[in-house]
């Protein structure tokens, strides 16, 4: 837990975490690592339709059979510990907004990611749009508790898919000067957003610093699809950061037990974290192992369940043993409206992430309906709660350089 946190904040986190802290469970953590090593060695990870990834893993000692590569977990840990930074600086257009991510730093909070639907302040329900997206970015900028404006806060359903990465980039750069997350629609989109963001930040590349953090998901069980693999490679080679995550549904895409989910998720993220270091030693990474019980009767995850919080505490400790920053989830819920269920479930998940020492907390505001909806009302309430941990107001963003804005608009028009 960072020493910079206020005394009362540390006391609250200690109170929440006291019953769960796994630091003393050395035998349990070693058992998870050994079991994940066995999964990697005997079952392997499936890397779909990406010969480059399979070739580089074979050169690193992996044994490939078709698109399945069996790996040495201990060697993957050595690669990660040797090269991956324990802390890095995520830069914004405004240097005053730069945020450290990792060891000793307070958690970074970012809003919901990927919601197709929106509930407006008046209760009306709409599909996401370009206009609404800009309003959500502006709300994230104005919220002192949110130190990152995220990515794909809602889906721009009124914009063609090939234009969305640049439209979202323009919204993040013009409506805020905080750091934000990168785009993974395709390797080409990721690289375009990286290059244009670097031009907007207008500071030379520096060791231990980057401009964007990208969400790279494994697909449980034990699979990586081609687009995340190719994006991971492009991002690492550019020196930008990746948040390599396994997001499991316990009993559906992972074992139903906490221990089983941790073993599978750890095996999946070890492969992705090591790949980033193989492509570019020192590439910034964040590790995420997240698992939620899956209700087979309703065919829906149960967000807020205590089992997921136990997964978070052990995942955080596994990340610290690797020496990398750790991801947590924010105020996520299965509730359909912003009610007592929403507050109770979201509060439990967010508290577990904070108390576990998570470095980057995604979905920190706005989440409803298993993530299918972003609510303006809940967005504001979650952000207001987070603001109590920091400063009360945010100044307006610095103006975006006109040449950068013109270049982005020109590319959008060509698309």
Region locations from a protein language model:
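N-terminal basic/disordered segments at the start of proteins
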Residues: 1-28, 88-113
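Catalytic-core signal marking the mid-to-C-terminal active-site face
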Residues: 2-11, 22-35, 43-58, 377-415
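Short beta-alpha connecting loops at secondary-structure transitions
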Residues: 17-21, 298-303, 331-338, 366-378
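N-terminal small/glycine-rich loop or linker at the start of catalytic domains
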Residues: 28-32, 37, 101-123, 321-333
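Glycine-rich, N-terminal phosphate-binding loop and its surrounding beta-alpha-beta segment
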Residues: 51, 55-120
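Short juxta-domain linker segments that transition from a proline/glycine-rich
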Residues: 102-104, 108-112, 132, 141, ...
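Helix-rich catalytic cores of soluble enzyme domains
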Residues: 124-355, 359
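Short acidic/histidine-rich active-site segments
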Residues: 359-367
